[in-house]
């Protein structure tokens, strides 16, 4: 993972006073133009600096067609950050601290999401085990869920969110830095943090799909936001085909003759009830 220690722990980092901050900020900026880069998701795994994760969310919101998957500070310190043993690097009171820190940021965006805690994965090439930020598992689950069903199906639960060997992340997830109780899961979910839970029979499972939108609405769910991103992209492509054409009934009919079948297809595949 990225060595976050090269970034100071204050919130005063800028492109001009920290080379690492500038490097990552520039990398994020390379995908800010939707006409230049096609994507539907953005993440910088392992980077927990609040200014940079906010930049990820801002880029996704400004584009209006991507979901940002961010990591949060205080969950776990990898060996690149701390030479102490594993138990010391896992902060005993981290859950409450992470929840409090996220609430203090006053985020309210349906274009972002976050997960807890870190996961242990097995390198498929070397067989070695390593700890990875939760965004890594989440991204894999999004991809496998979309491949197995549709982008508007929730990438969570035992069917589409199972992370244990052969599971949804696309690579074996063998452990977590912290096993969550039912009360822990409730605390995280109320703070719009998606828990990665461990169950005796089912193993390790992503057990939530909230966005970082605090305002209650359908868009506080990941699958709804991804549905809207999908529809917006497809409708935009249809609309581009009639750009600058005459504003007459024949043009409107050309648009609806393509848009209606698209929406009907989404409805048939359980993405919409009506349109």
Model-derived features: positions:
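Structured, hydrophobic secondary-structure cores that serve as assembly/anchoring elements
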Residues: 1-275
């Amino acid at each position: 993972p990225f060595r976050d220690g090269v970034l100071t722990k204050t919130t005063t980092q800028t492109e001009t006073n920290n080379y690492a901050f500038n490097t990552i900020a520039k990398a994020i900026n390379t995908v800010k133009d939707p006409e230049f880069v096609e994507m539907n998701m953005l993440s910088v795994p392992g980077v927990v600096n609040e200014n940079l994760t906010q930049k990820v969310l801002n880029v996704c919101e400004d584009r209006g067609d991507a979901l940002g998957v961010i990591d949060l500070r205080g969950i776990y310190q990898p060996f690149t950050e701390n030479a102490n043993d594993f138990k010391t690097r896992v902060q005993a009171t981290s859950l409450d601290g992470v929840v409090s820190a996220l609430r203090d940021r006053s985020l309210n965006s349906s274009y972002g999401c976050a997960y807890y805690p870190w996961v242990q994965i097995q390198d498929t090439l070397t067989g070695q085990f390593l700890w990875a930020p939760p965004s890594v598992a989440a991204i894999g689950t999004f991809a496998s869920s979309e491949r197995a069903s549709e982008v508007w199906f929730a990438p969570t639960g035992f069917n589409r969110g199972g992370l244990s060997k052969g599971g949804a992340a696309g690579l074996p997830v063998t452990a977590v830095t912290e096993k969550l109780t039912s009360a822990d899961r409730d605390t995280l979910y109320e703070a719009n943090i998606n828990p990665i839970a461990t169950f005796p029979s089912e193993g390790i499972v992503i057990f939530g799909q909230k966005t970082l939108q605090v305002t209650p609405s359908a868009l506080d769910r990941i699958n709804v936001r991804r549905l809207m991103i999908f529809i917006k992209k497809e409708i935009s492509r249809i609309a581009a085909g009639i750009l600058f054409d005459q504003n007459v009934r024949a043009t409107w009919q050309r648009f609806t003759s393509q848009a209606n079948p698209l929406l009907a297809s989404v409805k048939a595949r359980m993405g919409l009830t009506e349109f």
